[in-house]
């Protein structure tokens, strides 16, 4: 699979040798076919290339030459036989928020549905796209999302234990199926443990979208409780930590108190 972003319909219609196909979902702007390659343009401006891997790579090189858009992914998803459960997490490295773990279960038919939605690693999507795609994913595949707030995280403070617990709970809820985990340090769950699994298995990519959507929703909730917008990540958080302290708010309810950048404010 190859994905381009910032692609215009008018540019695709000028391509020679491609025939128009009937769109398969309401989110498709245009679907073209040439030989063993499908070009699927979504309303977000993302163009998905699917089909024979060699033919897809050849077509992608041609599209790059004419600057059709920005190439953002060129890694084909691996395919397992039968039902596969993919799990991924979000907020693990964020100062604000607790943890969110999501699981998605799919077979060949549902994997095709996820591909037609344009599912990719959530890191390739803007926040708005993540929230929109998460809702679509929930409507076509079995899924589960586990979200814990900072207060619960801080009662345990053992992130490895929590991650193993939440990944397993998601997989157990969706069982049966082969469990693929986005591998993390100390991972003891899953039949297949792979680093960067969200770029290799479409089930994990879909789970990464659900987990990140859950993280955004949790940060929105915590922001409403704090009375000001809480930042994502851990790089630019000092002003927000200072604001928490100035307002006399309980740090345990908003941040991971075991993070080194938090300790100086306690």
Model-derived segments and spans:
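RNase H-like, Mg2+-dependent phosphodiesterase core
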Residues: 1-266
């Amino acid at each position: 699979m190859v994905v381009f972003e910032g692609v215009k319909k008018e540019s695709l219609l000028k391509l020679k040798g491609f025939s128009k196909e009937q769109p398969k979902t309401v989110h498709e702007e245009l679907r073209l076919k040439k030989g063993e390659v499908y070009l699927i343009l979504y309303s977000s401006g993302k163009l998905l290339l699917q089909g024979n891997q060699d033919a897809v790579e050849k077509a992608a090189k041609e599209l790059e030459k004419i600057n059709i858009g920005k190439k953002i992914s060129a890694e084909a998803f691996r395919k397992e036989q039968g039902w596969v459960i993919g799990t991924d997490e979000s907020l693990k490295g964020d100062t604000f928020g607790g943890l969110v773990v999501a699981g998605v279960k799919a077979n060949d038919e549902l994997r095709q549905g996820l591909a037609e939605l344009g599912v990719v690693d959530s890191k390739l999507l803007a926040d708005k796209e993540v929230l929109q795609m998460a809702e679509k994913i929930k409507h076509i595949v079995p899924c589960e999302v586990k979200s814990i707030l900072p207060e619960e995280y801080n009662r345990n403070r053992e992130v490895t234990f929590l991650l193993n617990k939440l990944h397993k709970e998601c997989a157990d809820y969706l069982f049966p199926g082969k469990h693929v985990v986005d591998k993390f340090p100390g991972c003891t769950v899953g039949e297949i443990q792979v680093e960067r699994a969200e770029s290799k298995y479409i089930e994990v990519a879909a789970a990464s979208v659900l987990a990140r959507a859950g993280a955004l929703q949790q940060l929105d909730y915590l922001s409403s409780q704090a009375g000001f917008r809480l930042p994502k990540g851990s790089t630019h958080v000092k002003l927000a930590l200072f604001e928490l302290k100035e307002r006399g708010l309980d740090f345990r309810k908003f941040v991971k108190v075991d993070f080194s950048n938090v300790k100086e404010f306690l």
